[in-house]
């Protein structure tokens, strides 16, 4: 597989691009390679779709916890997006084990409840993992909102998916003051052939058949990108994360979601077309 992949680490000084826009993000406004918040995919903006961003105050600053596009008709997030940087990578608290609760930003009638999980044979699987947000108690508690939950089989949730989450956290926590890892996670809820089933045969409660991640790493003035696509199964096809890797373009084809659309077009096109597993420590 690796022989067929091209390296996509791109150094800005080698790109014949004039960067004139700036990243409009309160967490990091010193970048000039994007026209908006980098981690956000393009919104579908359907009649039942709601865009939500949760924030916390950390060290006296307003910090983005995570963002989501939530489909009220399916009681499930289409995706969750967040970042690891010099602030948000910090591990100042442990898992809160706060009671799972309704997201105050969305009407509770549009959210799932405990009975939709355990009694149906599914874990309340975090999309933005508890271990992704450990820089404050408040942000960790936000990860327990039901809008951040997805019905996952226990062997998947505590198996290959957990392994991938741990690897991504390792990459994210390697960030220095000039680095950022942008992360998008989700489960498939839009295409019928990508739905595993429905909780209690209720069409408003789909169970994703696949889960994915899209990653963009800015390290100094260089960039790299990679994606992962996993079938939601009790038995993984492989225990090696490298076997689930693909390009961002390939993930977009599968999901119908446009990832990292706020990047400068030339940079986006180059990064998303290819990937290199060798560029990601611990993957091979």
Region locations from a protein language model:
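Domain-level detector for secreted/extracellular nuclease and nuclease-toxin modules, and
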Residues: 22-284
């Amino acid at each position: 597989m690796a022989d067929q992949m091209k390296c996509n680490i791109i150094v800005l000084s080698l790109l014949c691009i004039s960067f004139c826009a700036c990243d409009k993000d309160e967490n990091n406004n010193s970048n000039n390679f994007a026209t908006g918040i980098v981690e956000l995919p393009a919104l579908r903006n359907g009649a039942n779709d709601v865009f939500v961003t949760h924030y916390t105050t950390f060290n006296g600053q307003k910090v983005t916890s995570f963002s989501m596009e939530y489909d009220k008709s399916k009681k499930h997030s289409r995706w969750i997006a967040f970042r690891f940087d010099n602030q948000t990578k910090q591990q100042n608290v442990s898992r809160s084990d706060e009671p799972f609760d309704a997201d105050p930003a969305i009407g509770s009638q549009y959210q799932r409840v405990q009975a939709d999980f355990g009694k149906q044979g599914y874990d309340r699987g975090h999309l933005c993992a508890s271990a992704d947000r450990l820089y404050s108690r408040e942000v960790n508690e936000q990860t327990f909102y039901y809008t951040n939950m997805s019905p996952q089989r226990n062997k998947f949730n505590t198996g290959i998916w957990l392994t991938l989450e741990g690897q991504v956290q390792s990459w994210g926590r390697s960030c220095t003051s000039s680095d950022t890892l942008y992360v998008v996670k989700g489960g498939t809820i839009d295409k019928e052939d990508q739905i595993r089933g429905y909780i209690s045969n209720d069409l408003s409660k789909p169970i994703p058949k696949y889960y994915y991640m899209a990653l963009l790493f800015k390290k100094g003035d260089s960039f790299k990108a990679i994606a992962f696509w996993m079938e939601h199964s009790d038995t993984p096809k492989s225990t090696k994360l490298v076997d689930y890797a693909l390009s961002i373009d390939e993930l977009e084809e599968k999901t119908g979601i446009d990832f990292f659309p706020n990047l400068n077009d030339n940079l986006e096109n180059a990064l998303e077309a290819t990937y290199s597993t060798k560029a990601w420590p611990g993957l091979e």
